[in-house]
Every structure is written in C-alpha cells, then in structure tokens.
C-alpha cells in the first residue's frame, strides 16, 4: 500500500486534496477531533510526505487524550522535518501528558530558548506547569 500513488489512482489534483484538508480543519475548529482525525489520516495516505498533515494527526491525538498515539504520530512528523517547532511543542505536551516527564522537561528546556516567542512562551508555560517546584523555605519563629 505504501508504494501506491493514491492521488494518481483517484485522478485527484491538489485542489481536491486542499478541499479535504480544509474540511478536516473545519472539524478541528468545531472541536470535532474524532471526525477531523479521519480526514487528516486520509491526507497522510494521499501525501505521506506532507509535514502539516502528519503533525496535525499528532496534535489531534493530543486533543483526544491519546498521548501514546500522539507521540508516535509526532515522531513520524519529525522524521519529515526534525526541527519543526510546532511539532516539537506538541510532542512536548504529549510527553508530559503521557507521564514521560523527564523527556518532556528536556525538550521544554530546549524549546524555551527558541527564537520564536510563541514557541518559547509555550515551553515556559509547560515548564511552569510540569517542572518540580522547589520546596518552600521554612520560616523560623523568632523567640
């Protein structure tokens, strides 16, 4: 199945693929992630090298609370482009939510220094939410 050019078999052009993508995106905007997932999984079959579709599958799995599936999908997307920061942020979220805290902390520490302020601030927020907080200093009573 991996060697079949489905676009050619279906006789589809890029405009049909884009319509499918926009329909999937509309379901995401409505919060209907389970329906959107079907669209984006189909898109990854039609164009297995499309980073946007691959990382969107991972992001949808995060929204659905299927964190192990999210990690698999996001790692696949990173094989297409290893330094794609939106994918890395979603992977970081998925790692924390899958209780893989050490991996999430390492990735968040790297991302907090990203030149893109949106990425850096999301990483900072994840660190604030998931990093172990220092124990409060005990206050000694004065006698």
Task: Give the residues covered by each predicted segment.
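TPR-adjacent "capping" and linker segments in tetratricopeptide-repeat scaffold/adaptor proteins
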Residues: 2-19
């Amino acid at each position: 199945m991996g060697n079949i050019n489905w676009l050619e078999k279906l006789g589809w052009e890029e405009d049909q693929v884009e319509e499918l993508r926009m329909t999937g995106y509309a379901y995401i905007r409505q919060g209907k992630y389970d329906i959107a997932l079907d669209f984006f999984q189909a898109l990854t079959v039609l164009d297995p090298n499309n980073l946007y579709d691959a990382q969107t599958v991972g992001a949808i799995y995060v929204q659905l609370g299927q964190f192990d599936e999210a990690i698999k999908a996001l790692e696949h997307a990173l094989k297409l482009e290893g330094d794609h920061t939106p994918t890395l942020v979603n992977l970081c979220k998925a790692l924390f939510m899958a209780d893989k805290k050490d991996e999430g902390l390492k990735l968040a520490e790297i991302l907090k220094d990203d030149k893109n302020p949106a990425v850096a601030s999301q990483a900072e927020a994840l660190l604030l939410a998931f990093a172990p907080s220092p124990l409060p200093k005990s206050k000694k009573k004065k006698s």
